[in-house]
């Protein structure tokens, strides 16, 4: 019985000491190096384009182009609303309610 056990153990040791093949993870390093190199090259190209101002004329042409007059059809003409004083009115504070409190507080705390 002892002889049979030794052959099984020696077979297990030989199977675990073999080097892994290319299919089990040997190709992971070249892929990782390729991705890192691609990212570095892309960032260098973007930095060079920014430093050399390659896109400046395209950016300037968008900045200095006048707006088209076709898009302004939904705006009301200037001077149409006479009540527009520049303040946003919500109905949380009623108009005129603050004026009465200020006059009453002045009479109460007059010096």
Curated annotation (Swiss-Prot):
Biological role stated in the UniProt entry: May be involved in membrane trafficking between endosomes and plasma membrane.
Organism: Mus musculus (Mouse)
Organ and tissue specificity: Expressed in stomach, kidney, large and small intestine and kidney.
Keywords associated with the record: Cell membrane, Endosome, Glycoprotein, Membrane, Signal-anchor, Transmembrane, Transmembrane helix
Keyword Transmembrane part of the UniProt annotation: yes
Topology, Cytoplasmic side: 49-111
Biased composition (Acidic residues): 79-88
Name under which the protein is recorded: Type III endosome membrane protein TEMP
One Pfam family here: LRR19-TM
Superkingdom classification of source: Eukaryota
Ranges annotated as spanning the membrane: 28-48
Family annotation (PANTHER family): LEUCINE-RICH REPEAT-CONTAINING PROTEIN 19 LRRC19 FAMILY MEMBER, TYPE III ENDOSOME MEMBRANE PROTEIN TEMP
Region Disordered, residue ranges: 64-111
């Amino acid at each position: 019985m002892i002889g049979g056990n030794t052959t099984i153990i020696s077979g297990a040791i030989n199977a675990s000491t073999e080097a892994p093949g290319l299919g089990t993870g040997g190709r992971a390093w070249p892929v990782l190096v390729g991705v890192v190199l691609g990212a570095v090259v892309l960032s260098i190209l973007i930095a060079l384009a920014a430093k050399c101002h390659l896109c400046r004329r395209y950016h300037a042409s968008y900045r200095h182009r006048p707006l088209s007059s076709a898009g302004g059809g939904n705006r009301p003409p200037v001077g149409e609303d006479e009540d527009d004083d520049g303040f946003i009115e919500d109905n949380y504070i009623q108009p005129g309610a603050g004026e009465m409190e200020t006059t009453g507080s002045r009479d109460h705390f007059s010096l």
